[in-house]
Amino acid sequence: MASRSCICQVSAGIIFLIGAALLVAGLVIVLNVFPNIVNNQINDSKVLGLNADGTLNSFTDSWVNSKYISTMQYWVYDYTNTIGIMNRAIYPDVREKGPYAFDEILTMDKLNFSENGEFMEFRQIQTFVFNPNKSCAGCDPYKDKVLIPDMGFQVGIDQIDTVIEGILKNPLAATICHAIMKGKPNANQTCSNLGALIEGELGTLISLFNVSPFTTVTVDQLLFSGYKTPFVEKFLDEALGMLHFLFGTAPKPLDDPPIQLNPLNGTSDIINTVLTGKTDPLKAGYMTEFRSISNNSLFNSIGNTLPPMWWPYANKTYCKDPNSALVLTGTNGDYFKNFVKKTDILPAFVSDVCRTIHFVFDREVTVKGFKGYRFVMPPTQFDYSLDENCGYCIPLKYGSYEYPAQSACLPSGLLDISQCTGGPIIMSKPHFYQASKVVSKFVPRFKPTYDNDETMLDIEPNTGTVLQAQKRLQINMLVNQFKHIRSYSVMRPGAYPLAWVNESFYMDQNTIDQLNSQLFTPVSTVNTICWIAVGLGAGLIALSIVMVIVSFCCFRDEHHKTS
């Protein structure tokens, strides 16, 4: 009997050792070895470059020839109370029309790799094709019209007001006036009053040419094809010519290009340079510079520094971090680094706002079965009370909202990109979401919400793959108040909305299959095998313990019987 008990205990010991080995091996593999293998595989595969035969490697090919489902949706604003805005300082009231949906086709060309394989050049072209099936019922951008603030009017009235002020201060004009008023009492005061009268009645003169601060355009003209401003066509050219004839003051020649919100449909002048990730896979796709093919200095970065004319006040002495606004860093938002953590701040250069945006973690999400992290654009990005945003302040020539002339910058929630675009364009989140109160109340009809107005990036954290994204921005125009021109001295100065946009990206089936085949299927398979081994090992250990206990009990009973 003792022999059988001994055999049982030895067998239990062997089973225990086998179980312990399976348990330890399974835990080591699932918790240490395999994650390292997967991490190395992800890093090795996320490098932009070529195969040995000169073709694009898998990662580069999937990016360059992306099949993501991309749609650009526009909602445009139709102003309904322009008379009240101009004559009674009423807040703007608008009707929102849309969405006008456009299929976005992304193509890349002019690919080039540096000799050392560290850098890649490319040009990305966006082409937009109207899709009535995704748009609002009956919406037609080529026929639908909206009444909007005229950007050309604002630029033109600013320029002519400057010219008139220059003329009135011209010694020749003063001499002529005094000659006319010769011998009359208070000639100086009369000439001064006459100058103020001329400037004050400029609006009346302009109205004779059937020109207004607002104009009617089609949706397509506003977005893509462009419109010619009536202010230049009907008034400014003739008025400046008359002033030049009378006073000999040569005005600056006026360009009259079409005005549109998206002038780059189907074309691009920019060559981007990014890191390939050869040295550091976590920096794959990081922007290092961009340049204009036509050598337009406005669109040439200086290495990883944005064009200084975009943010000309970034180097002012009162900015504690003068270079913060000019830093070019991060990817272009098509993908992000591997192994994203919730505490990470993800940089991306967003050309729509002419600056780098830093995204922060918001919440966990699930997209088509994949677990992801949602990152959003925090309100701190447009908060000018923060030192790092000092360089984005553009002094207000005429003042705006409750801010006086020459104020340091706009209220928080707005971004002045006029130096980058060449027009009085102000960017914000749609419906002034998260903007300061003085901004959010400017259009009382707006009711901003997180779901409709926040920019969202849903990212698979292991690979940095964008599962889906919603880039939401509002395009506004800065309307100034010309206090010396009576007809325009009442209008509330501020950011008048023109349109808001939702540029959405969704994974295509190929991306889903790649994530499954390259990452999740192998991980799931190995994890399953390892945890089965762990479970089997734990079961064998439990079995061996039971065998020892049973053997001990049986041996003790037999021992009592024989004794």
Curated annotation (Swiss-Prot):
The keyword Transport does not apply. Residues 35-528 are lumenal. One of its GO terms (cellular component) is membrane. Glycans are attached at N43, N112, N133, N188, N265, N295, N315, N502. One of its GO terms (molecular function) is scavenger receptor activity. Keywords: Glycoprotein, Membrane, Transmembrane, Transmembrane helix. Pfam families: CD36 (PF01130). The keyword Ion transport does not apply. Residues 1-13, 550-563 are cytoplasmic. It is found in: Membrane. It is a multi-pass membrane protein. The chain crosses the membrane at residues 14-34, 529-549. It comes from the Eukaryota. Belongs to the CD36 family. This is Uncharacterized protein C03F11.3.
